């Protein structure tokens, strides 16, 4: 038993597994080819011609905001990586997925010792429970939106989690400024991820204020405001208003919310039941 525990906490095994996760995702990305919207995003939304340089992306995104939607950060990455050799995206996307696994591990175990079994378990759970794994984790357009949006959200919330735990965070001025700027990008990234990040950030700040009896940090309040600015920019873009609000109205958002809850029940009910059991056990024991 001691040998197994020692092996489970071995840092070299842990890092080897991290490298293995990266390798698996790199191979899967390498053999995932362009599909569907990838081909339309190869062309500029402004000129309808093939994008040749990075500078072509900026007028394309301006036209995208007017005609499609205001989700510009995610689609900037889509057009950027469609412009670059495909191998670059294979590496970057594998890195982002590995970062997702690591931040989930960090949230669950915080500052505890390395746990190789837990790392593999998190990878397996994400693999099994992520809806449409290929579309959200491998496909270029889909992963730039959903995988990256989820990963960026968890990393952006990390300082708020540290704050709630009374740990030191955001001590440098440059760090705070960059965090505020990143807040606008986070708010403009993906409707669901952006809104969820804003709500969770507010809840963590409220917990810090009323449960820990501490003042609201300036960087925390400022980042919520920049996220809100980015979110409003995305939701009020002419393309968003024309294609989403105008066609479906408020009831469309209500229907989407109901459908999303149905999907959560369908795919994540088992995880929810496990969570309830663990919470009950932690209270009783």
PLM segments and residue spans:
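Start-transfer (signal-anchor) and selected internal transmembrane alpha helices
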Residues: 1-25
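Membrane-interface helix-boundary motifs at transmembrane edges
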Residues: 6-7, 105-116, 164-172, 208-219, ...
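Aromatic-anchored segments of alpha-helical transmembrane domains
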Residues: 22-23, 123-131, 183-188, 226-236
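Transmembrane catalytic cores of multi-pass membrane glycosyltransferases
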Residues: 29-87, 91, 140, 189-285
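Membrane-embedded alpha-helical segments of multi-pass membrane proteins
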Residues: 91-100, 143-156, 198-199, 272, ...
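Membrane-interface micro-motifs in multi-pass membrane enzymes
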Residues: 118-164
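Membrane-interface alpha helices of multi-pass inner-membrane proteins
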Residues: 174-197
């Amino acid at each position: 038993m001691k040998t197994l525990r020692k092996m489970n906490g071995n840092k070299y095994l842990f890092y080897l597994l991290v490298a293995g996760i990266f390798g698996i995702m790199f191979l899967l990305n390498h053999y995932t080819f362009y599909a569907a919207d990838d081909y339309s995003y190869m062309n500029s939304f402004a000129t309808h011609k093939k994008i040749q340089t990075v500078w072509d992306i900026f007028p394309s995104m301006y036209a995208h905001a007017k005609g499609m939607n205001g989700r510009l950060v995610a689609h900037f990455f889509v057009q950027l990586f469609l412009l670059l050799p495909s191998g670059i995206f294979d590496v970057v996307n594998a890195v982002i997925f590995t970062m997702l696994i690591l931040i989930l591990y960090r949230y669950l175990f915080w500052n505890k010792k390395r746990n190789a079994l837990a790392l593999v378990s998190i990878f397996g759970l994400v693999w099994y429970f992520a809806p449409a794994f290929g579309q959200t984790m491998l496909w270029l357009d889909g992963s730039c939106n959903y995988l990256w949006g989820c990963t960026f959200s968890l990393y952006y919330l990390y300082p708020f989690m540290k704050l709630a735990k009374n740990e030191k965070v955001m001590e440098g001025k440059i760090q705070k400024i960059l965090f505020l700027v990143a807040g606008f990008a986070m708010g403009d990234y993906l409707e669901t991820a952006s809104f969820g990040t804003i709500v969770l950030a507010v809840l963590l700040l409220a917990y810090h204020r009323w449960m820990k009896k501490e003042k609201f940090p300036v960087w925390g309040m400022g980042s919520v405001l920049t996220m809100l600015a980015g979110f409003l920019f995305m939701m009020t873009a002419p393309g968003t208003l024309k294609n989403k609000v105008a066609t479906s109205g408020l009831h469309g958002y209500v229907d989407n919310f109901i459908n999303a809850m149905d999907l959560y029940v369908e795919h994540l009910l088992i995880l929810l039941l496990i969570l309830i059991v663990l919470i009950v056990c932690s209270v009783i024991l």
